[in-house]
Structures are given as C-alpha cells and as structure tokens.
C-alpha cells in the first residue's frame, strides 16, 4: 500500500526522492528498530552488533542509560532501573499496583492518576520512560541511515485500548518522532510474511515472548486485517521456561539453598544458555562453578510441557471467542524468541494442523512488518499493490434517486474522519432502502466506482419523506470505511465495511481525477437534468395519490386542466430538456394550488368531525 502525497494530476513533486522511515517494535522485554534498504526489510544493530535493545532505562543524577548496560545494573540499583514499562502504559497507579503488587519502584500518582516513578533523576512516568527507549532506537536508525527519520510505524498489542495507544503516540512525539501509524503487532507479523496480499481467510498469530503470551486471530478480507479475537496469558513466557530449567539444574547439582542470589543468577544464566543450545541440538553440557551436568531436549520438554499446554488452551479459548475452528485457519505465524523452542513449534503445528511460519526470525518479525508498512506509508512505494492513505484520494458517497451521487466525504479529507447526512424515503409506505456506496468525482452513479451495497429494512411505513435515515461514513486510520444507516425513530440500522483503496492503483486514481475534470461541464448538466427528472417523478407520484383520494373535490374543467398539465410534465420528463421539465413543474404547481388548499380544508374537517369546540 502506498501512502500517496496527494496532489493534482501531473503536479506531484519530487517523485524520486526517497524518504527515511523505520518500523519500531516497542516491546515489554526488548525493542527493535527496522527499515527497508534496497528493497529488503532488516533490523538495525547497534555498534556492538546487537539487534535487540533491552527495554530498560537506568536513571542517574547526571542523565540516563538505555539497554543492556542498564539491565546489567538492575540488580545493584533496582529503584532507579526501570524495566517492563510497557505494562504501565495508559494505566492508573491504582491499576498498576493491583496488577503488579511486587514492583520494586517508589511510585506516587500524578494529578491525572498516572504512575510517577521516583528516581535519582527525578520523577518519571511511563510515557517519559518509553520516550527514552524510542529515542535510543531513533538514534540508532538515524546513525545507520545517515539522516533524520521522516516517519515511523510503532507496533502495539492488538488489545491495547485508546489510552494505551495514545500514551504510545505521546511517547513517540516526546522522542521527536513523527508517527505515521500505530500497527497491531499480529498484523505487523502477518505483513512481514506477505500475508496482506495473500488469499483471504483466517490467520493465527502465536506470540510467546519472554514475559507474556498473546494469541491473535485475524481475518484477512479485501486487503483489510480484522482482529477477530485476542487472548493469552500476561504471566507466562520464556522466562518461566528458564526458571523451571534453572530449578531443575540446581536439584541435579544438589543445591537447594536459595539464599545465595549470585549463585541463583548463575544457574539462571546457565539455564538460558542451555535452552538456546537445545533448540538446535539434542543435549548440552551445563557448567556452574565446580558443577557440571548434562541436560537433554527431552528433559527440557518434560519440564515445560505443562506451560506449552497452557498456551494451547488459550488458543482454544480465543478461537472459540473468534467464532472460527482450527480448520479455518490458513496460516499460523510464530512471533517471539520463545517460539524457537522445538516443542513449542511442534505442539502449535499439531494443534492447528499445519506447519507454522518460522522462516523470519521470531524476535524480529514484528519490527520487519512495521518497517515494510513504514516504507509504504512514507511514500517510497507508489506502485505497491496495496494502498493506505492518510487522506482520501477520491470522494466517497452514495446513490440517490435518479442515479445521482451524493458526496458524503470529499476527496483530500484527512483521515480518520466521520461524516453523516440524513435522507428520507421517496415513496409512501416505503419500508426498505438500498444503500449503494460509491467512490469517485463524477456526478452520475454509472461514472463512479461501486464499493458496496446493503439494504436497511424495517423502516416504518410512513408517507414519502416521513422517515428519516441517518447515513454515517467513517474512515479509520487504516483507510477502512464503515457505512451505517439508521432509521431515527426506531433505531433500526444496517452497516457494512469496505476498503475503498483495495485493488486501486495510483494511476487509476489519477485517471479518475482527470476524467472528472475533463467531463465537469457535461457532468453538471447531466446532474441538473437528473435532478429535475427526480423532482418531476416526485411531483407526479404525489399528484397521482392525491387524485385517487380526493378528485371529487374538483370540477370537470379543473380536473381536465390538471390532467393536461400532468400529461405535459410527463412528456417533458421523458425528454432531455432540463428547462422544459422545470417549466412544466411550475405550470402543474400553479394548476394544483387550489386543489391542495381544498384537500387541506377537507382533511381538517374530517379530523374535527364529531368533536366539540371545547374538545379541540
């Protein structure tokens, strides 16, 4: 999808100037930054060659440090070393303390209730800590790319609410970054594998990180990823594998005393190294101090099998919440370093009945997907198959009587946006209305692009114009259009979602704009003619009903004169002269004014019949 710099056809500026963009995976345990270079998405390493940046910040009186160095000092300076700050994003202090009662920090609430952490550098909040991590990633990207970033895409969990998403945006702005978009982490992983241009269907994203497990069920339809359901376990991750193995190793070494924190740390480090080794070999040797032992993959599998089973139970629940079966899942994407464990891959494959996608480094797949999206959104791929827009390139509207288009959202409107208009029924007793959604700049339906049709049923059977239908067009930040039609008195409604940009190239957009300019005068004339034809039909329909009901109120000559004007209007409406139709409507209006007055008097007399003046 190319983010277009919308301009008038033929006036696009600097078409070959490449912009610098990055994708950022702002993780709970580790963060990464990636970019697209020479057509390939890749994560960027620091000067030591490390791609993962630990999401840890240590605050000191003279400043702060971010990453591995900060993490190494966490044990010695826990009050000033902040980690897993993502868990606090968008939450109140009370919520944080209820969820995580054993945090080592000294915290108090700000005026807005946000947690404030007391450090040697002063009080900091989750937004500021996240901004420091983002700034470190930004500096890495700018050093690698040789210039300032034009924009970034930052990933967030699919379950993040508005407050958490806004907090992430605020952190990015504080770090001096221009946020092109927040992208759901499972969607980013799917994009990294190119699933956004694949066949339509259900995709599962299994994300097992160091401290958390998330399962997301997505549906891909016409280029749109819809999150059907999310689930998981916020207290289950690869760290739990490490602790189980470390405890087992201590038992093998005959060391059950846990009072020596340094020794416990060495066993934990040894467990991590063993777990990594067993991902590629059947057994490995473990050395801690004077003790040496062996551990096999089978032994590790036996230890962690109950935890892996817990993740699969969460998958089962989330599939049920999504209303889909395992057989409906087309692809399973593996995310998170802990999915390298062979037992995890095997069990997940058996559960879903298909081989999971694992060819992209699971630690990096989310950042890579974000980088691909950022490269598109910043405008470096104008010929991409998909199209995401920060403005609407072509007007969106709906069909009205006479084959006309009523524009609801004009082109070049910034998104996200929502607009609404009210419409009424055309005929007496009308109980349904067809909503035809269109895209384009022309005046007539036939000259525009049809996006979708749906029907609003259950409209009360009132006289023409009596029912009021409010039609709302809403386009979100990803260009997804939702159209909702609601009858105001009953609240009955119908809706549809569509991707206006799906399957539409920049050349086609430009072509449609040029057509609208070239045909502007003719289109306006055609619209005026169609509008007069619709008005003529409305007048004739109304007159037909009135004559059927109250023609006895007219004398023979009066009725003949009205019939003559009625026939003349019908003849004019069958022709193509706008002025002739307009004139015929005026003649018929003049002929029926007295008839309308008599009908009003008759209606009042019928309403008052049988009632006294006092009752009135």
Swiss-Prot record:
GO molecular function: ATP binding; ATP hydrolysis activity; ATP-dependent protein folding chaperone; unfolded protein binding
Keyword ATP-binding included in the entry's annotation: yes
Alphabetized Gene3D superfamilies for the sequence: 1.20.1270.10, 3.30.420.40, Actin, Chain A, domain 4, Substrate Binding Domain Of DNAk, Chain A, domain 1
Cited Pfam families: HSP70
Keyword entries, A-Z: ATP-binding, Chaperone, Nucleotide-binding
GO BP terms, alphabetized: iron-sulfur cluster assembly
UniProt record similarity statement: Belongs to the heat shock protein 70 family.
Its job: Chaperone involved in the maturation of iron-sulfur cluster-containing proteins. Has a low intrinsic ATPase activity which is markedly stimulated by HscB. Involved in the maturation of IscU.
Full protein name: Chaperone protein HscA
Gene: hscA
């Amino acid at each position: 999808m190319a983010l277009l710099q919308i301009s008038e056809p033929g006036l696009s500026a600097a078409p070959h100037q490449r912009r610098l963009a990055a994708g950022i995976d702002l993780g709970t345990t580790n963060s990464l930054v990636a970019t697209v270079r020479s057509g390939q998405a890749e994560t960027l390493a620091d000067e030591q060659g490390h791609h993962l940046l630990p999401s840890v910040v240590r605050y000191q009186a003279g400043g702060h440090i971010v990453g591995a160095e900060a993490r190494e000092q966490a044990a010695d300076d826990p009050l000033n070393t902040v980690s897993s700050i993502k868990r606090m994003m968008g939450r109140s202090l009370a919520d944080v303390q209820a969820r995580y009662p054993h945090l080592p920090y000294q915290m108090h609430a700000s005026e807005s209730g946000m947690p404030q952490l007391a450090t040697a550098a002063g009080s900091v909040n989750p937004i500021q800590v996240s901004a420091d991590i983002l700034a470190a990633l930004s500096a890495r990207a700018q050093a690698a790319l040789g210039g300032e970033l034009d924009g970034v895409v930052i990933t967030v969990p699919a379950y993040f609410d508005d407050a958490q998403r806004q907090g992430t945006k605020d952190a990015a702005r504080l770090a001096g970054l221009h946020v092109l978009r927040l992208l759901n982490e499972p969607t980013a992983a799917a994009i990294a594998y190119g699933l956004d241009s694949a066949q339509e269907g259900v995709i599962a994203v299994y994300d097992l990180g160091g401290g958390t497990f998330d399962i997301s069920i997505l549906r891909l339809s016409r280029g749109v990823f819809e999150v059907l359901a999310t689930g998981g376990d916020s207290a289950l991750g690869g760290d739990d594998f490490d602790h189980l193995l470390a405890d087992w190793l201590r038992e093998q070494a005959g060391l059950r005393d846990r009072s020596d924190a340094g020794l416990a740390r060495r066993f934990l480090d040894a467990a991590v190294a063993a777990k990594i080794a067993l991902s590629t070999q059947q057994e490995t040797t473990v050395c801690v101090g004077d003790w040496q032992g062996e551990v096999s993959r089978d032994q590790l599998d036996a230890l962690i099998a109950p935890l892996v089973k817990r993740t699969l139970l969460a998958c089962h629940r989330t599939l049920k919440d999504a209303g889909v079966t395992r057989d409906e899942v087309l692809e399973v994407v593996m995310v998170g370093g802990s999915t390298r464990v062979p037992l995890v891959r095997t069990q997940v494959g058996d559960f879903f009945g298909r081989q999971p996608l694992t060819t992209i480094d699971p630690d990096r797949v989310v950042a890579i997907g974000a980088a691909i999206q950022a490269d598109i959104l910043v405008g470096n791929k104008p010929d991409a198959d998909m199209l995401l827009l920060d403005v609407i390139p072509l007007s969106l509207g709906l069909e009205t009587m006479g084959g006309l288009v009523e524009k609801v959202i004009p082109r070049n409107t910034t998104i996200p946006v929502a607009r609404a208009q009210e419409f009424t029924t055309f005929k007496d007793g009308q109980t349904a209305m067809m909503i035809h959604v269109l895209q384009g700049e022309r005046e007539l339906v036939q000259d525009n692009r049809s996006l979708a049709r749906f029907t609003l049923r259950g409209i009360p059977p009132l006289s023409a114009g009596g029912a009021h239908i409010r039609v709302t067009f809403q386009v979100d930040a990803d260009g997804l259009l939702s159209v909702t039609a609601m009858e105001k008195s009953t609240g009955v409604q119908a809706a549809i979602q569509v991707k206006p940009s799906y399957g539409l190239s920049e050349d086609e957009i430009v072509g449609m704009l040029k057509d609208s300019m070239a045909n502007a005068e003719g289109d306006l004339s055609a619209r005026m003619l169609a509008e007069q034809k619709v008005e003529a039909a409305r007048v004739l329909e109304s007159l037909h009903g009135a004559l059927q009901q109250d023609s006895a109120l007219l004398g023979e000559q009066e009725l003949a004169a009205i019939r003559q004007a009625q026939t003349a209007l019908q003849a004019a409406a069958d022709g193509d002269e706008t002025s002739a139709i307009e004139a015929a409507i005026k003649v018929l209006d003049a002929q029926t004014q007295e008839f309308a007055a008599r009908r009003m008097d008759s209606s009042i007399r019928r309403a008052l019949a049988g009632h006294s003046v006092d009752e009135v």
